[in-house]
UniProtKB/Swiss-Prot annotation:
Pfam families: Mito_morph_reg (PF14972). Plays a role in mitochondrial morphogenesis. Keywords: Membrane, Mitochondrion, Mitochondrion inner membrane, Transmembrane, Transmembrane helix. InterPro entries: TMEM11. It is found in: Mitochondrion inner membrane. GO terms for cellular component: mitochondrial inner membrane. It is a multi-pass membrane protein. The keyword Membrane applies. It comes from the Eukaryota. Belongs to the TMEM11 family. The keyword Mitochondrion applies. It comes from Xenopus laevis. The chain crosses the membrane at residues 79-95, 102-119. This is Transmembrane protein 11-A, mitochondrial.
Length: 187
């Protein structure tokens, strides 16, 4: 029974790894006066700018707001990619006389989402983070020290590839829309 409760590092097993102090930051929910919410926001901003690998947000309100902000950014990214792809692939799937009814609005939507993401999210340090839901990865974090039962955990991820992807697709959709509008109105 000495190994009960431990994971064995064998084939298919996972070894529990401890994190260094510089990898994880916890925004604790400690109310010290009237400006506690401002203090939580300040701590979160400092942690985002310090680029910690993991940020654990204990205060419910600011954690929910941050999770929603990340979700909206993800939605804009996915909408830009999917609508841009629809814009570019619709002419291959539909007859030429009908394809512009789908491809032009999809291209405009892709460009709008990509532009909004670029203006509102691109320079925000929060866009480098994703909300973590994986139970194994969460088990590696020092969550036993928290007072909140449902903290929001952010993990830093490199987003350069996703930005390149949605910008490339949006620009290709823009080029297609300009070409198609020129063809439609030059005749």
């Amino acid at each position: 029974m000495a190994t009960w409760g431990r994971r064995r590092a064998g084939l298919g097993g996972r070894e529990r790894v401890t994190l260094s102090a510089g990898e994880c930051y916890i925004v604790h929910e400690i109310y010290n006066g009237e400006n506690a919410q401002d203090q939580f926001e300040y701590e979160l901003e400092q942690a985002l700018e310090a680029q910690y690998k993991y940020i654990v947000i204990e205060p419910t309100r600011i954690g929910d707001e941050t999770a929603r902000w990340v979700t909206v950014g993800n939605c804009l990214h996915k909408t830009a990619v999917l609508s841009g792809t629809a814009c570019l692939l619709t002419p291959l799937a539909l007859p030429a006389e009908y394809s512009h009814y789908v491809s032009l609005p999809a291209g405009v939507l892709s460009l709008a989402c990509s532009t909004l993401y670029g203006i509102s999210w691109q320079f925000d340090p929060c866009c480098k983070y994703q909300v973590e839901y994986d139970a194994y990865k969460l088990s590696r974090l020092p969550l036993h020290t928290l007072t909140s039962s449902s903290p929001v955990v952010l993990v830093r991820k490199d987003d350069i590839h996703r930005k390149r992807l949605h910008n490339t697709i949006a620009l290709a959709a823009l080029a297609y829309c300009i070409k198609k509008l020129y063809e439609l109105y030059s005749v």
